[in-house]
């Protein structure tokens, strides 16, 4: 396990002074980058190989949204590396040990020079010692787009520089912000999130969000398909509020 301590900042909260979902994802992404940079297979090593870990899917369960100034612990637990695939959990706890959020993620090691997945090297395996997976209700990596429900198209989004990460692709967390901004209902409090990443979006690409809303008991479930100009799904996100 790898972890670091932090405190919820004003720049990370919404109008209710609670941590936003994209800020939570940023914490998780920072945690895995910190572990990578502190180990023998850092980003410079990956760059020399022309490789990067590409996120396939998220599942995030939020038990409570922490508030401004709360002290928190963010951690990650790699639990399996198999061929080109990496599997890791994340968590956010309070300083007192209350679990605030738990997540599962699946990654592929991709060689951008050859355009193919590649097997993790011994150095990478050393960098990410595996442990037992965390307790959570593990769902499918695949997200089916519902045929029923209330469907509408949201305003198109042009990919800007601020959407990009160091791989010159849209950052994983930015897709979540796009999905949230596409909802007619604003300032929703997300309790569960799933995301399946299918393609990479680049600078200047146009994203066409399609939202399908369904009800399940007391919850609203929003499935957001972020499509490219060809109508292909770049990323599909499911939000339970």
Regions found by a protein language model. Name each.
Residues 1-55, 102-104, 111-187:
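Hot-dog-fold acyl-thioester-processing enzymes
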Residues 2-4, 61, 67-142, 201-203, ...:
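HotDog/MaoC-like acyl-thioester-processing domains
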Residues 35-73, 77-80, 85, 174-213, ...:
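Hydrophobic beta-strand-centered segment that forms part of the acyl-chain substrate-binding groove
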């Amino acid at each position: 396990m790898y972890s670091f301590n932090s405190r919820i900042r004003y720049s990370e909260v919404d109008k209710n002074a609670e941590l936003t979902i994209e800020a939570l994802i940023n914490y998780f992404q920072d945690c895995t980058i910190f572990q990578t940079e502190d180990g023998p297979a850092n980003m410079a090593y990956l760059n020399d190989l022309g490789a990067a870990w590409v996120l396939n899917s998220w599942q995030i369960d939020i038990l409570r949204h922490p508030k401004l100034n709360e002290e928190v612990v963010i951690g990650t637990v790699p639990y399996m590396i198999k061929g080109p695939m990496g599997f890791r959990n994340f968590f956010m706890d309070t300083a007192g040990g209350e679990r605030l959020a738990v997540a599962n993620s699946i990654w592929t090691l991709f060689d951008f020079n050859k355009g193919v997945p590649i097997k993790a090297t011994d150095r990478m395996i050393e960098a990410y010692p595996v442990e037992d997976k965390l307790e959570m209700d593990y769902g499918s990596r695949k997200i089916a787009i519902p045929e029923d429900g209330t469907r509408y198209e949201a305003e198109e989004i042009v990919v800007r520089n601020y959407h990009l990460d160091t791989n010159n692709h849209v950052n994983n967390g930015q897709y979540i912000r796009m999905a949230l901004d596409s909802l007619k209902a604003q300032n929703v409090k997300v309790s569960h999130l799933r995301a399946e990443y299918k393609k990479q979006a680049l600078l200047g690409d146009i994203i066409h969000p399609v939202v399908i809303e369904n009800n399940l008991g007391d919850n609203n479930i929003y499935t957001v398909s972020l499509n490219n100009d060809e109508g292909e799904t770049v990323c599909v996100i499911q939000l339970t509020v």
